[in-house]
Curated annotation (Swiss-Prot):
Pfam families: dTDP_sugar_isom. Pathway: Spore coat biogenesis; spore coat polysaccharide biosynthesis. The keyword Disulfide bond does not apply. GO terms for biological process: dTDP-rhamnose biosynthetic process; polysaccharide biosynthetic process. InterPro entries: RmlC-like, RmlC-like_jellyroll, RmlC_Cupin_sf. Keywords: NADP, Oxidoreductase. This is Spore coat polysaccharide biosynthesis protein SpsL. GO terms for cellular component: cytosol. It comes from the Bacteria. GO terms for molecular function: dTDP-4-dehydrorhamnose 3,5-epimerase activity; oxidoreductase activity. To dTDP-4-dehydrorhamnose reductase.
C-alpha cells in the first residue's frame, strides 16, 4: 500500500427500513483540515485520470456505481515512490479512500450504470490558482493498463 493512503471500510447498519452508515467523523483524523466537499457524476466507460495535488489531500467515496481507482506515488521523499495501488470501490464495496498530496489518482467507471463520487478535500478549490497537475491517462511512466482482463 502506498505510504499515507488510508482505507476506511464503511459499516452499513441495515434493517427493514433501509440502512444507515457513517462516512466521516471528526475523531478519525482522516482529513487534517476540511476544505471543501464536492459531488460529481461520470458515465459508463469514462476514465478520469490522472491528476495530483501539491498542497491538498483528497478523501473519496463512491455511493453509486462501480469504480476502478488507480493511485501512483510521485513523491520524491516517499518510501513507496513509483508504486501503484488499485482499488475497486462503489456501492457493492463501500469505503473511503484518503489520497495524500503528491499521489497521482484517477478512476475508470465499471459496469453499465453511472458512477457518483462525493469527495472531500483539505483546501477549497481556487480557480485562479488551482492545486491540480495533470498527467495523461496513458502515461508511460505510470504504465497502467486500463483494459479489463477477461479470465
Amino acid at each position: 500500500m502506498i505510504d499515507g493512503v488510508k482505507v476506511k471500510k464503511l459499516m452499513k447498519h441495515s434493517d427493514d427500513r433501509g440502512f444507515f452508515a457513517e462516512l466521516v467523523r471528526d475523531d478519525e483524523n482522516l482529513l487534517e483540515h476540511f476544505g471543501q466537499a464536492s459531488w460529481s457524476k461520470s458515465y459508463p466507460g469514462v476514465i478520469k485520470a490522472f491528476h495530483y495535488h501539491e498542497k491538498q489531500d483528497d478523501l473519496w467515496f463512491f455511493p453509486t456505481g462501480h469504480a476502478q481507482v488507480v493511485l501512483y506515488d510521485l513523491r520524491e521523499d516517499s518510501k513507496t515512490k513509483g508504486e501503484t495501488d488499485v482499488y475497486y470501490m462503489g456501492e457493492d464495496n463501500p469505503m473511503l479512500l484518503l489520497i495524500p498530496k503528491g499521489v497521482a489518482h484517477g478512476y475508470r467507471v465499471l459496469g453499465e450504470t453511472p458512477l457518483t463520487i462525493i469527495y472531500f478535500t483539505t483546501m477549497s478549490y481556487n480557480p485562479d490558482q488551482p492545486d491540480e497537475k495533470r498527467i495523461p491517462w496513458d502515461d508511460e511512466t505510470i504504465g497502467f493498463n486500463w483494459n479489463t482482463e477477461f479470465r
